[in-house]
């Protein structure tokens, strides 16, 4: 049986094992997928041992995405632009191929929601790894991107790095123009600490739609709660992105794209 896993620290909260087992059953693929707690000091050796024991691939989550990127011998274009990976595949020659399916997962979810049309103005909150992982696919989807961040220089650096791929610019968080954005995406990690980014509430009130990359099964994320308080009605959390990135990783490994619609049409599985 082919072996796969997701690596992270912490890892107990990961929904990847449930998703990939569901995909395997749906597509009749014979595989085993588990969650593994990575050791921050020994991660590289752990991963090397994992593949030496015959594993076919794995997913990578925080805090190991950049370290896994450096271990791979080959990389997809979107992975190179992100400078981090969330998916590794062992090739026939024994080398590791790295991909980053986060952006593909986001784009596929925005398409599912019918929120993605050419030449929209999308404001992204945050200039960290989560943003870097989705910029290329969004720009390839002909979106006009504006990035804002608590540290403006980080937003400027990202805009400069990605302007070769499309229309992108940085905005000072304290001086975002009061105007309607087609979509606001929260890519900050503030929600993990129960906080929200310090943004002018008028910006949220005028937004056509808002999307939080974070996902919480138990309750609204802090960002979504804030948006609801400001009267925003067109809102989505990151569950669909989670499902989408997993589906694209599964396709990379197995050559078959799982059907994800059943996950949004009822409680077919517990995620």
Curated annotation (Swiss-Prot):
Region forming the signal peptide: none
Gene Ontology MF term list: NADP binding; shikimate 3-dehydrogenase (NADP+) activity
InterPro entries in the record: Aminoacid_DH-like_N_sf, NAD(P)-bd_dom_sf, SDH_C, Shikimate_DH, Shikimate_DH-bd_N, Shikimate_DH_fam, Shikm_DH/Glu-tRNA_Rdtase
GO terms of biological process kind: amino acid biosynthetic process; aromatic amino acid family biosynthetic process; chorismate biosynthetic process; shikimate metabolic process
GO cellular component: cytosol
Binding residues annotated for NADP(+), in chain numbering: 126-130, 149-154, 213, 238
Pathways per UniProt: Metabolic intermediate biosynthesis; chorismate biosynthesis; chorismate from D-erythrose 4-phosphate and phosphoenolpyruvate: step 4/7
EC numbers on record: 1.1.1.25
Keyword Zinc-finger: no
Active site positions: 65 (proton acceptor)
Family annotation (SUPFAM superfamilies): Aminoacid dehydrogenase-like, N-terminal domain, NAD(P)-binding Rossmann-fold domains
Disulphide linkage map: none
Keywords, ordered alphabetically: Amino-acid biosynthesis, Aromatic amino acid biosynthesis, NADP, Oxidoreductase
Catalytic function, reaction form: shikimate + NADP(+) = 3-dehydroshikimate + NADPH + H(+)
Residues that bind shikimate: 14-16, 61, 86, 102, 215
Top EC category: oxidoreductase
Cited PANTHER family: BIFUNCTIONAL 3-DEHYDROQUINATE DEHYDRATASE_SHIKIMATE DEHYDROGENASE, CHLOROPLASTIC, SHIKIMATE DEHYDROGENASE
UniProt similarity note: Belongs to the shikimate dehydrogenase family.
Function: Involved in the biosynthesis of the chorismate, which leads to the biosynthesis of aromatic amino acids. Catalyzes the reversible NADPH linked reduction of 3-dehydroshikimate (DHSA) to yield shikimate (SA).
Subunit structure: Homodimer.
UniProt name for this protein: Shikimate dehydrogenase (NADP(+))
Taxonomic lineage: Bacteria, Pseudomonadati, Pseudomonadota, Gammaproteobacteria, Pasteurellales
């Amino acid at each position: 049986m082919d072996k796969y896993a997701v690596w992270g620290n912490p890892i107990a909260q990961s929904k990847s094992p449930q998703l990939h087992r569901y995909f395997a059953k749906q597509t009749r693929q014979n595989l085993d997928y588990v969650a593994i707690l990575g050791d921050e000091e020994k991660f590289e050796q752990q991963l090397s041992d994992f593949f030496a024991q015959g594993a076919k691939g794995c997913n990578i989550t925080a805090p190991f995405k950049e370290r896994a990127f450096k271990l791979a011998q080959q990389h997809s274009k979107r992975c190179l632009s992100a400078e981090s990976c969330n998916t590794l595949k062992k090739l026939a020659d024994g080398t590791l191929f790295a991909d980053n399916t986060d952006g593909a997962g986001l784009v596929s979810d925005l398409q599912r929601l019918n929120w993605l049309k050419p030449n929209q103005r999308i404001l992204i909150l945050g200039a960290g790894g989560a943003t870097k992982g989705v910029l290329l696919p969004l720009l390839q989807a002909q979106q006009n991107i504006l990035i804002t961040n608590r540290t403006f220089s980080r937003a400027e650096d990202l805009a400069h790095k990605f302007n070769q791929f499309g229309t992108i610019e940085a905005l000072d968080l304290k001086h975002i123009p009061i105007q309607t954005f087609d979509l606001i995406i929260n890519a900050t990690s503030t929600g993990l600490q129960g906080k929200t980014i310090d943004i002018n509430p008028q910006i949220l009130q005028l937004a056509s739609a808002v999307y939080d990359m974070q996902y919480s099964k138990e309750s609204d994320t802090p960002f979504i709660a804030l948006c609801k308080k400001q009267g925003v009605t067109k809102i989505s959390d990151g569950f669909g992105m989670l499902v989408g990135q997993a589906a694209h990783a599964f396709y990379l490994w197995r050559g078959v794209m799982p059907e994800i619609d059943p996950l949004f049409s009822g409680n077919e599985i517990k995620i």
